[in-house]
Amino acid sequence: ADWNDALDMAAEHGESVAFTCAYAGNLEELAGLLRVLAERGHREVELLEELELLLEKENRLPDFLHLCAHSVRGSKRRFDTLALADTLQAMAERLREHIRKTEWIAGENEGWFNSYYDNHQNRVEGYFPGGVRMMLTGQVFAVMSGTATPAQTSLICRAADRYLYRKEVGGYRLNTDFHEEKFDLGRMFGFAYGEKENGAVFSHMSVMYANALYRRGFIREGYKALQSLAETAMDFETSRIYPGIPEYFNADGRGLYHYLTGAASWYILTFITQVFGVRGELGGLVIEPKLVREQFDGEGAAQISLHFAGKAYEITLQNPQRLDYGAYKIVSASCNGEPMQTDGVRVRVPAQDATENCILLTLGGRL
């Protein structure tokens, strides 16, 4: 099992392409952080000496697992920061290229990545005699990690809209109907299609899909995923729930298990860090708005209040021309009345002494 703990019957020979994508993304992110450390004068980093096995070109994972099965010695050694960054970056690129070459499922004006291998070592997804088999999880991690190229991401969106999207039940289903009890992969196939992990609109993964799309610049597509969840949750006649994000919407669009989901926190995280674009970056506060026209009020404004590094911020975006994302840029920015520099896309907010701060960003046309 990876994110989907109902894929639990392929322990001997199964593989998670989805999480391999995630590993590639993590390796690249670590490489980037190491380069920042090097730029700031940290020429070496100290790590547990057992980790050196994982940096060798040969497959030493079994040796590493055996060595660390019960404990680590606690001894450390120093590694050259830039050399380590280059090693991790190369590992990330090898994983990505391998997945792009071996796991891409090409269709006519559509495509997606295979997410898993079953316990018989067979690819799970693709075009089958009994119908198309597609799972959302592999697409989320491929897009989020940068494994999917921009062109592939566009094709994934087309395939997801065609095979997984059902607006009337909340948006993007977790998978298509496999029409079998596939117990060489997981117990999820014991559920009726549209229930739980077998083809329900699983809110957590839908929000992660939106988050991934926003990160990669597919703003309208990300908005569609978020808005579909919200509209279904707010439609009592369909969802039969009080307003909120449930674990999943079933085949009838009914929301279930409010208390058993990480989707709510991911939804808030995505809205703050991607939609409003307010996030921490290497210790500083950055604002990179990605709101679409519909998300501004009747006066062309959008506002968010939050805390960052112990300080309170009220951030207002003014869009007087009611421009859509892609048509606007940041034309001016200020904090507590003091102008801030912007490149038109984002603003890096200088550290503030005040405990309460007001930020105003004005958006205008790109031309």
Predicted regions and their residues:
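Acidic, mature catalytic/reactive cores of soluble proteins
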Residues: 1-367
